[in-house]
A protein has these predicted regions:
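Long, contiguous interaction/recruitment modules in multidomain scaffold/adaptor proteins
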Residues: 1-15, 34-35, 39-41
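Short helix-capping and inter-helix turn/linker motifs at the boundaries of alpha-helical repeat units
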Residues: 7-8, 24, 115
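Alpha-helical tetratricopeptide repeat
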Residues: 7-19, 46-50, 83-87, 121-122
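Amphipathic coiled-coil alpha-helices
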Residues: 13, 17-20, 29-32, 60, ...
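Extracytoplasmic/periplasmic/luminal assembly and interaction segments
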Residues: 24-76
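Soluble extracytoplasmic domains of inner/organellar membrane proteins
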Residues: 56, 65-168
Length: 168
């Protein structure tokens, strides 16, 4: 019963903070959402981090990655939710991380049969295409086309990128 009460308190805190959020009190709400993340609640910790990111409340990539790692290492997430958090971490890091870090971030997803695997492969393909590493990009796009788990939308995006960039 104590666990249910704590869960309800965290839920109420998240709802209040997300509804009442305003830029004038950004520091207060940043603290509120970080407290929710520190609660290690499997529902609201990831949602709090996504709120902070989506509303551009966090300025430091280092802090964002620290909070991602805190959730990934300390929150008991369902497998696909954890893979979604990993994928989202990859998305956030794609603009500034070197390739070895990007692959390290996404490795747990691309080495699995997760729903998020094709999304991660597409992200890496786009990452390498943007960097001018066409063969690496093509390799990731090709993995999508041969995967059993690829949804039609991701399959079509990979196929279009191969046709557009490689004429195949």
């Amino acid at each position: 019963d104590i666990v249910k009460k704590q869960k309800a308190e965290i839920a109420n805190k998240f709802i209040k903070a997300s509804i009442n959020y305003n830029l004038k009190e950004e520091a207060y709400y940043s603290k509120e959402f970080k407290e929710i993340i520190n609660s290690h609640d499997s529902t609201y910790a990831p949602l709090a981090l996504f709120f902070l990111i989506d509303n551009k409340i966090l300025n430091s990539n280092e802090e964002i990655n620290h909070l991602f790692d805190q959730i990934l290492n300390n929150v008991n997430l369902e497998r696909e939710i954890k893979n979604l958090v990993i994928y989202k971490k990859g998305l956030i890091n794609a603009d500034f991380q070197p390739e070895n870090i990007m692959i390290e971030i996404l490795k747990p997803v691309i080495n699995s049969e997760s729903f998020w695997k094709p999304h991660s492969l597409l992200l890496l393909g786009d990452y390498f295409l943007f960097k001018g590493e066409r063969q690496k990009a093509k390799d990731f796009y090709s993995q999508i086309l041969t995967s059993q788990k690829t949804n039609e939308n991701i399959f079509n995006q990979a196929q279009q990128r191969i046709l557009k960039n490689y004429g195949e």
